[in-house]
Swiss-Prot record:
<dbReference type="InterPro" id="IPR036183">
    <property type="entry name" value="YajQ-like_sf"/>
</dbReference>
<comment type="function">
    <text>Nucleotide-binding protein.</text>
</comment>
<dbReference type="InterPro" id="IPR035570">
    <property type="entry name" value="UPF0234_N"/>
</dbReference>
<dbReference type="GO" id="GO:0000166">
    <property type="term" value="F:nucleotide binding"/>
</dbReference>
<dbReference type="InterPro" id="IPR007551">
    <property type="entry name" value="DUF520"/>
</dbReference>
<comment type="similarity">
    <text>Belongs to the YajQ family.</text>
</comment>
<dbReference type="InterPro" id="IPR035571">
    <property type="entry name" value="UPF0234-like_C"/>
</dbReference>
<keyword id="KW-0547">Nucleotide-binding</keyword>
<protein>
    <recommendedName>
        <fullName>Nucleotide-binding protein Pnuc_0290</fullName>
    </recommendedName>
</protein>
<dbReference type="Pfam" id="PF04461">
    <property type="entry name" value="DUF520"/>
</dbReference>
<dbReference type="GO" id="GO:0005829">
    <property type="term" value="C:cytosol"/>
</dbReference>
Length: 161
């Protein structure tokens, strides 16, 4: 029986490439000369450093731009906290969203059931498994979810025939 999983995970390789490109652009830009502005990745979070609020905003804009060019959805990042570290220097932490929250998974299951497509959806941890009789039904379900769910970037993997 054909099936696939609905997940919410960024491509970590592309995210790392976007971070490296951001740091390279920041080091080469004239308006960042002599500043300690950079982007670091620690486990499941990104840490942005800037000399002041304006430069921190510029670092964030550069990162978002590079993520968009590498097809990494910005909705994977959730602003956590901004703090002052010594003098005027600022640090912002952004959490990387991995996995579907329970409320989002319930919404996905409800959308699938309300659509009357002949598929079954079951919540399995931080993913939703969708199984159906025909491949076309699964593809129709994918299109429906892409259209209906806008608050989180959904991905589809483990497509089995």
């Amino acid at each position: 029986m054909p099936s696939f999983d609905v997940v919410c995970e960024p491509d970590m390789v592309e995210l790392k490439n976007a971070i490296e490109q951001s740091n390279k652009e920041i080091s080469n830009r004239f308006d960042f000369k002599g500043s300690d502005s950079r982007v670091e990745q620690k486990d499941e979070a990104l840490i942005l450093f800037g000399d002041d609020d304006f430069k921190l905003g510029q670092v964030r804009d550069v990162l978002v731009n590079k993520m968009a060019k590498r097809n990494v959805d910005v909705r994977y990042l959730k602003d956590d906290k901004t703090e002052t570290i010594g003098g005027d220097k600022r640090k912002q932490t952004m959490k990387i969203q991995k996995g579907i929250t329970s409320e989002l998974s319930k919404k996905v299951v409800r959308i699938i059931k309300d659509s009357k497509i002949k598929v079954q959806a079951s919540i399995q941890g931080d993913a939703v498994r969708v199984t159906g009789g025909k491949r076309d039904d699964l593809q129709e379900t994918m299109a429906l979810l892409k259209k209906e769910v806008t608050e989180a970037p959904l991905g589809f993997n483990n497509f089995r025939d």
